[in-house]
Amino acid sequence: MNKSHHPHRGLLLMVVAPSGVGKTSLTRRLVSDHGDLHLSISATTRDPRPGEHDGRDYHFVSRDKFQGMLAEDAFLEWAEVYGNFYGSPKAPIMDALSRGESVLFDIDFQGAMKVHKQAGADSVLVYILPPSLAEMSRRLHTRSQDSEEVIHRRLSRAKDEVAAWEQFDYVILNDDFDRAYADLAHIYHAERLKRARNPWIGDLVSDLLKEEI
């Protein structure tokens, strides 16, 4: 029996990390390497950063548009971060799950906790640790996107998140990108193989037990 022809139960894979730890590079590569994994593209009211594109990195919307989406209950979760709003549009996520496909969230801590509270066993929480706060600070200064005040807030928030590491199913140290990516890919593969996400196995077992020896 070819298991590729049998339905899976999709999962919500949430990857959380402080800014400057490499989360975006890890998640984009995972989606690129796995055709059955879809990236949840968040809507945000913040301005695009250099190199970001609407519809690929984020859906960049006005505050009025975001408020309208809130009124329509269009988000699975939403949050205000550093004065800007972020939200995960519900419709594409539900569509992917209905096809038995999985959805990857490149998401912040509070957003991940909200989704996990709603999705329960259908969600998997992964936290990416920096090798040190000093290295994280160096990366944030190197990319020259934030003021000193914002960088300080990001570092303080990172310490608060790291203190909550036990709330996550998996924790990955990103001191080597290729190794961290391999760990993330292994987590995704293992979660997809779980019995609860492969309902077709029950029918296969029933057929096997009916066979004469």
UniProtKB/Swiss-Prot annotation:
Gene: gmk
An MF annotation (GO) of this entry: guanylate kinase activity
A GO CC term assigned to this protein in UniProt: cytosol
UniProt-listed SUPFAM superfamilies: P-loop containing nucleoside triphosphate hydrolases
Enzyme's top EC category: transferase
Keyword match tRNA-binding: no
Compartments, record wording: Cytoplasm
SMART domains hit by this protein: GuKc (SM00072)
Entries under Pfam families matching the protein: Guanylate_kin
Binding site for ATP: 17-24
Keywords recorded for this protein, A-Z: ATP-binding, Cytoplasm, Kinase, Nucleotide-binding, Transferase
EC assignment: 2.7.4.8
Record-stated family: Belongs to the guanylate kinase family.
Biological function: Essential for recycling GMP and indirectly, cGMP.
Catalytic activity: GMP + ATP = GDP + ADP
Protein name: Guanylate kinase
Residue ranges occupied by any Guanylate kinase-like domain in the UniProt entry: 10-189
Domain of life of the organism encoding this protein: Bacteria
Species classification: Bacteria, Pseudomonadati, Pseudomonadota, Alphaproteobacteria, Caulobacterales
